[in-house]
Amino acid sequence: MLVSSSYVLAQSNNNLCVGHYYSEEEAKNVLAELKHQYNTKEEWKQRAELIRNGILKGADLVPFPKKTPLKPIYTKKRSYDGYTVQNVAIESLPGVFVTGSLYLPENTNVKMPGILSTHGHWSDPEEYGRFREDAQMRNAGLAKMGAAVFAYDMVGYGEMQELGWKHKHPLAFKQQLWNSIRALDFLLSIENVDPERIGITGASGGGTQAFMLAAVDERIKVSVPVVQVSAHFFGGCVCESGMPVHKSENHQTNNVEIAALAAPRPMLLVSDGDDWTKNTPNVEFPHIQYIYKLMDAEKNVENAHLPNDKHGYEFSKRKEVYPFLAKHLMLDLSAILNSDGRISEKEIVVEPMRKLKVFSNENPIPDYAVKSNDEVNW
């Protein structure tokens, strides 16, 4: 049977925590109650294991699917000032093609960090994910600083959407988390990528992908979820909260605790004053900071709050992210500084969508490609 029983589970489960699940006041009270459950490092580690297992079980990823060959397909490399771009497709499962773009620094003959670049939800196909100007800017900027950056399409977006995949599918969370795990496998397979310097960053729904992967996969050493970690908002899309990953018969959690599973690994929360992260400095961040303190790593977590900003990953936010990743992944921040010593993305080329595609008439997708969510053989 191609569609597992989790399809039914995801549609009917009473344990789903969706969207604005709590009021802002309720969320504060919940965090206060949770805080009393862990007063020592060992108590938090026990709680963390319960939450981590809850994510994997709720996503129907226990046991893990067998990891099959990624079989990457590459397009021709394009060279720019200080970095290159090459489109890539990998198989997260046999025939399930995850499409993306690989940004590499000019010099790949030395050990380099690896960064996964995730994206959120947009309505205009030409502004989808990795095709967006803000995504291309950060991907190229980080590559210029010395990182290998893999930006990939989320389920039902970009080239996956063109194949016939749907984003609003009951098992989108499962597929998306698995795709991220395999994207990380691919990143680590690249020659000279340092497994001890692996990061992930993304905004909105991409922020959810960032903290979820960091929560379940300790190969992520540094995480930067942007405009998404909230005590009262659990994500409004099935790819974030459409499976019972926050609640089970023996536990209930939220995205604040899930983000804190990254402790003691470095994490930067980026928040703004115009969405569900507006309370971060006073609500979410202190709780996460408390957990990092229990883990003897209080200095490893930071919050960049931009009260006048709106939801997105614009330059003002990237200016906060570049130094943090440079510090913790040992990147060369000077590579994106202008003559005045300020961060500048002026030399970065924003490519048209057609250049960022893996498959075309000249490079057709293999005949055995899985072209819809319901055809996946787990």
Residue ranges and their predicted role:
Residues 8-97, 270-378:
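Alpha/beta-hydrolase-fold serine-hydrolase catalytic core, especially in secreted/extracellular enzymes
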Residues 109-192, 229-239, 244:
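Cap/lid segment of the alpha/beta-hydrolase catalytic domain
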Residues 202-214:
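Glycine-rich nucleophile elbow surrounding the catalytic serine of serine-hydrolase chemistry
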Residues 192-204:
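Alpha/beta-hydrolase fold nucleophile elbow
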Residues 220-260, 265, 272-285, 294-297:
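Mobile cap/lid helix-loop segments that gate and shape the active-site cleft of serine hydrolases
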Residues 76-132:
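Glycine-rich active-site/cofactor-binding loop and its immediate structural neighborhood
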Residues 111-113, 145-148, 194-197, 218-222, ...:
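Loop/turn elements at helix/coil->beta-strand transitions in domains of secreted/extracellular proteins
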